[in-house]
Amino acid sequence: NQNEHKVTFKIKNIYASEYPEMVLKNIPVEFKLGNGFQIIGNTGSFDLCGQKITLKYGRNVLTYSIEAEIAPIAVQNNLETFIFNKGVNLSYWMTEADRNWLGMVTLKQFPMWKELGFDHFRVPVDELCIFDKDHNFNKMAEEKLHEFFTWCEDNDMRAILDMHTLGPRKGSDKYVEQELYDPKYPEMRNNFVDLWTKLTEEFKCHSHSHIAFELLNEPHDYTEDASNWQGLQKEVLTAIRSIDPDRVVFVPSMGWQDPKYIKYAEFLDGDPNIVITFHYYLPMLLSHYKMLAWKDYQGKVQYPGIVMPDAADAAAYPKYAEFHRTTFNADRIMGDMRMASADGANMNRMVHCGEFGCSKNVDDTQRLAWFNDMVKAMNANGIPWTIWEALDGGFSFISMDWDDGTYSIDTDLLEILTGKSLSAGQASEILTKYGYKVK
């Protein structure tokens, strides 16, 4: 008689989630057989990719199919009280040092975001907006941050203080990130550590359940394994932990916070209060359509489907065609979010999408489809998120008409983000309530 059996192995830890089949082929399985059993074949070593082992026992031939079940890894719950899921970036409040944005966000307006269904803020800050050249606090910025953090504590909202942009070194008029890692410029490294030492000392008085830190926005040291950044990151974390050991700290993935670099993230041994944070704007030609570095492209874009659908556009803009003559859809986004979540789980860490967005230059139907697929994928994989630009920007869902200074809410997008359904009239009432002019 020949009987078919199945042997299933549970794997509790697997690395390189992008290519699980490659990993499984490199895990040897060796069998110890009881008396009377004999392997039919020339090998006694197998892998976990569906191979079959045939045994002989007396007159019986037994065939076993070898399969692997990758068990989910429970993320260690070190963030029991820092509870966050859906958030907004206060994108220009304390960034862009050449402009004075400090009056743009006021205490009166903070409750609006909670009413719209959000539970946290990411607060990008530029060094030159909150410090002077001697690293003394800008008093107005310091006071506003304390005021804001206190409001979050009193209203059960969370805030992530993000060091968004560093200032240039002395003698230079431009910040160059590579100088952070260059031994010729030790002052850059020392400056970065000093900034976080001062920030930690200043804001350690605020609740660990409500206020968190994010080390740096979109680092990109250009090493394959992010080794330059990892060394500096540990130095900064050591400085923070010497002052505030229990603060939740968001550690950015390398490569402009590419989710593919999550698996390289490093932190101090035994530090439970770490979240790995990434950004997601793929495909870039769609998300940044007619904006910033992609503004020269004037052809068509498409979502879902082939991002650059026209062959004529591909011929006219070959530098974009290489990455955008491909199909992008809900399955691709779901796969990327699944990978990000799995890579975090492999390190027993929560992951967070700190920025995502799509240009308002994109057709509304396509833009909403992209947002819908993004939010569904992040929610399905347990990834908390913070949309880029809450208010009046190229990505925002609250827009200002520059002709008359009136504001409006994209109610379709808001419903995708938070599930809150508003009529146009209700949206106008909320804006008016918080001091925004409406038509």
Positions of PLM-derived features:
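Alpha-helical scaffold elements lining the catalytic groove of polysaccharide deacetylases
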Residues: 332-333
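Beta-rich interaction/scaffold domains
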Residues: 1-72
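Short, polar loop/linker segments at the starts of domains and inter-domain junctions
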Residues: 4-9, 96-108, 291-296
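Aromatic-rich peripheral "rim/lid" segments of glycoside hydrolase catalytic domains that contact
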Residues: 362-439
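Active-site mouth of glycoside hydrolases
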Residues: 79-248, 253-263, 416-429, 434
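Short, hinge-like loop/turn segments at secondary-structure boundaries
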Residues: 140, 177-180, 266-270, 293-295, ...
